[in-house]
Design a protein with these regions (language model features):
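Membrane-embedded alpha-helical bundles of multi-pass transporters/translocases
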Residues: 1-283, 292-538
Length: 538
């Protein structure tokens, strides 16, 4: 069996494709609920309902987009066109979520208008997010079928993902310091800058990646031409940013943004200049791969879904993924309340706590990648998740003033969060190949979309219950422009439960499911050998 190794620039560009969704998702999960209750002034029950409705709409979009992307036929392939045309709406609708328009002088009436506005914008953003991110996630098995190379590719992906998450928190910290007494402007600038950086990251992947058996958007000559133009533009932004930073006594926010965007555009350009085309993406076998994928549309949608859910390892991966991301996003959505109200820390300190989680996760990502090659994905998941459960549970016991202990537990949680990024997404291509062995068809979009579908339905319910629990516990929302109120003991207890024991219990269920996951490294090698044998016979 020939090796399907990828060029470094391919891995780099592929990784950047998850940076945009990661930045926006991270900002949303850490700040949006807080923004609704403490900046827009919405009651927590109403705010939680907005998040839940948005996630339900997002979940409904996923299988539709998965099926449509599987059936898309263009010279650029099935996935890349979706990313190309969905990126600008993605950025625009993300930004619109951070505005607080005034519709009425009556606070109650205005709240209901805001409720409708945020639901419409969230629905449109989630539609654009799905159009960009779902085809992107389905690219992994299109780029390589090598077991270890896929883990390596996902390491790049989630390095950018976690790196983007950390970058978004650092950026949020700078912006918070720049506008300490103007939260409306603070979140306006945060939404705008995050949108720009995210769109550049997605376009980076879109214009560099080539799907198997398809043409790239830019040929080698155009890549070099655009690469030099982008590199020169990025260097100008970078120099202007440096100039503004070093000519200001205080931290110059626009200088920092110039440095970040300039560095990003420069790397984008360099990646295009030094790009190489992998032979396994354009040889005769790649052409056969493309022809085989074009036969999938003949299978009725209902039958495709039945085939997907008959794949038992797929159901295990769904359970593992659901447990991990429920824990991650439940914690993230409530963590800012925990830091400000339970630990009595300043809001400006929150990004550093979140960075302690994400920074540890970024470092451990490469450690787990190396270990998984030695002992397998399931064993890595067990080790990381046990550490995560211990750290998560410890948050319940912390009291105001125990800042050092908070950062230590945040780092411990980050060790586990890294396996949530790496392992479930590395398992999905193995499940897809088992389906290919059994059916002779490759349906990446179906598997990826339904994995995320169930996760989003679960998350929608969880976010709704968190919002309702805060309201039932007597949580006091802030009025726009006023100081954050002191919360009653019942609300503080609800926050502690949501940030510690609840995610830990969910993770225990994930461990139980992972114990029964059947595709080991040896089983996967056997699956690949049988697929190869079938291709040689045909």
């Amino acid at each position: 069996m020939k090796q399907e190794k990828l060029n470094f620039t391919t891995k780099l560009a592929y990784g950047s494709g998850d940076m945009g969704p990661a930045i926006t998702a991270n900002i949303l999960v850490f700040f949006l609920l807080y923004f609704f209750t403490n900046v827009a002034g919405l009651p927590p029950g109403m705010a939680g309902s907005i998040l839940a409705i948005g996630k339900i709409g997002d979940a409904i979009n996923d299988p539709i987009a998965g099926i449509l992307s599987d059936r898309t036929r263009t010279k650029w392939g099935r996935r890349i066109p979706w990313m190309l045309f969905g990126t600008i709406p993605f950025g625009v609708f993300f930004f619109l979520q951070w505005l607080v328009p005034t519709f009425s002088s009556d606070p109650n009436t205005n709240n209901w208008y805001l409720f409708a506005y945020y639901i419409v914008v969230a629905t449109l953003f989630n539609l654009a997010y799905t159009a960009v991110n779902l085809p992107y996630t389905a690219l992994t098995p299109e780029l390589t079928q090598d077991y270890n190379e896929r883990t390596n590719l996902n390491s790049f992906r989630f390095a950018f993902s976690i790196g983007g998450s950390i970058l978004s928190l650092i950026l949020a910290g700078f912006i918070s310091q720049a506008y300490p007494n103007d939260p409306l402007k603070e979140y306006f600038v945060l939404g705008l800058s995050s949108s720009l950086i995210s769109m550049i990251a997605i376009f980076w992947a879109t214009f560099r990646i080539q799907e198997k058996g398809s043409q790239p958007i830019l040929n080698q000559q155009l890549r070099k031409t655009f690469g030099f133009i982008l590199s020169a533009t990025g260097i100008v932004f970078f120099i202007l940013g440096i100039y503004r930073v070093f000519n200001d006594i205080n931290i110059n926010l626009y200088g920092v943004l110039g440095i970040l965007i300039g560095l990003q555009i420069t790397l984008f350009g360099i990646t295009l200049i030094f790009s190489k085309t992998e032979s396994h993406l354009c040889d005769a076998e790649a052409t056969l791969h493309r022809q085989s994928t074009q036969q999938e549309s003949s299978i009725p949608i209902k039958e495709q879904l039945k085939i997907a859910f008959r794949n038992k390892p797929f159901l295990y991966v769904i359970g593992i993924y659901l447990s991990c991301w429920l824990a991650v996003q439940l914690t993230a959505s409530i963590l800012i309340y925990y830091v400000v109200s339970c630990m009595k820390m300043d809001k400006a300190a929150f990004p550093t706590v979140a960075i302690a989680v994400q920074g540890t996760a970024l470092v451990m990502l490469f450690v787990w990648k190396y270990i998984s090659e030695k002992i397998g994905k399931r064993s890595v998941f067990f080790i990381g998740t046990v550490i995560w459960i211990v750290a998560q549970g410890g948050l319940f016991l912390l009291q105001p003033g125990q800042t050092r202990e908070l950062y230590l537990l945040a780092g411990g949680a980050g060790i586990g969060v890294s396996v949530a990024y790496l392992i479930p997404w590395s398992m999905i291509p193995d499940v897809i190949e088992l389906d290919e062995l059994n059916t002779g068809q490759r349906r990446e979009g179906i598997f990826y979309s339904f994995m995320v579908l169930l996760q989003k339905f679960g998350l929608a319910l969880a976010l709704f219950l968190v919002g309702q629990a805060l309201e039932w516990s007597g949580f006091i929302e802030a009025s726009p422009g006023e100081a954050i109120p002191v919360q009653p003991d019942t609300a503080l207890l609800a926050i502690r439960i949501a940030v510690a024991p609840l995610p830990a219990i969910i993770l225990v269920f994930g461990l139980v499911i992972a114990y029964f996951y059947p595709i080991t490294k040896e089983v996967h090698a056997d699956i690949r050998a049988k697929i190869q044998a079938k291709k040689q016979v045909s």
